[in-house]
Amino acid sequence: MIRGEPQEFRDMDNNDLAAMVKAVGNRFGYEDATASYSPMNEFKVKWTRTYKWISLDISDYLDDAPEDVMECLLTTIFRRIAGEDSVEYGQPLVDWLRSEGFVRSKQSLFVRRFRGLSLSTEGKHRDLTDSYRRLIDKGLVEEDPLTYIGWAIYPSTKIVGKTSAIMKVIAISEVLDSEAVSEDVLDYCLYSQLARVKLGFNPGPKRRGIEYDALLDKYPDRRVMDRKLECMNMHI
């Protein structure tokens, strides 16, 4: 498994962002529109607004995004604020977030900010690399050297894992690092999170439960695995 090495990030250019958000904001009727990049654990945009004034707080994972990508992001955000709840992000942004270059340049920073994520696949009793290899050997997943897999050191006792599909980072609950948990169950739990990575960034607000469920159905004896997790008071 390849893990991203720390990358050098240029200083955030809030001046360029301010000029762009002002122009886009004016198109949507805002007399005063401001924005800045901020360090965030997740990829997201927050805003505060009144009738004619708006201020955006944008994740610094976007601080080096090309102009067309930021134009796409801002236009979509303003459209959603205006009530177009179903509008999807445009292709320039989607392509950029799904690119190998984005993951390579941002993943290590994301991992450093991810509280409770182990720096190794090796646990006390299980090694997630072994689980990943079994899934590959069975043809259930394709190997992706960009995917980062670790243990959630401070895990929920009920959820098997947490995943960032954008950053390709998977944290498996440390509760599953036990000899009492079968390899099949552990493999299924890892598969469930790899399925989220496979779906990738969701460009729209609509949930993709049907697509996700279809991927889970490809796992042999999925219903048996679900029942075993229920007996452990855990779920996907």
Language-model-derived ranges and their functions:
Residues 1-187, 197-236:
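Active-site-proximal or metal-binding-adjacent scaffold patches in catalytic folds
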